[in-house]
């Protein structure tokens, strides 16, 4: 079983999604302002996700605020590339989790 898991890990590291993410991350490293903006964006996303998980409905103002922040961030091409690569890698990993969850018929919250 562990050999298969290691094979999957190697395949993920060889995927275009992972390679693109690594390349985009390298462009961001050493740019403190870009790193901070991305961290602030992620923090705001997580705060809003936490509210949703608590059963609260986001206001239009909250949604628009996050969208405005995102639109400011993507003006920097390196940040835009990073966020897009991060999203593609996240989708790939989510798909893999879903496939595994369905294969073993376990209802895990992150496979939905």
From Swiss-Prot:
Disulfide bonds: none annotated. It holds the Pfam family Com_YlbF. InterPro entries: Com_YlbF, YheA/YmcA-like_dom_sf. It comes from the Bacteria. SUPFAM superfamilies: YheA/YmcA-like. Belongs to the UPF0342 family. This is UPF0342 protein STH1710.
């Amino acid at each position: 079983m562990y050999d298969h898991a290691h094979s999957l890990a190697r395949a993920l590291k060889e995927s275009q999604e992972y390679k693109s993410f690594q390349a985009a991350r390298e462009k961001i490293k050493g740019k403190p302002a870009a790193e901070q903006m991305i961290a602030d964006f992620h923090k705001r996303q997580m705060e809003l996700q936490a509210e949703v998980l608590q059963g609260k409905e986001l206001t239009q103002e909250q949604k628009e605020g996050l969208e405005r922040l995102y639109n400011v961030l993507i003006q920097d091409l390196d940040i835009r590339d990073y966020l897009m690569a991060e999203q593609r890698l996240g989708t790939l990993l989510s798909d893999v989790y879903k496939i595994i969850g369905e294969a073993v018929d376990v209802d895990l919250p992150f496979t939905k």
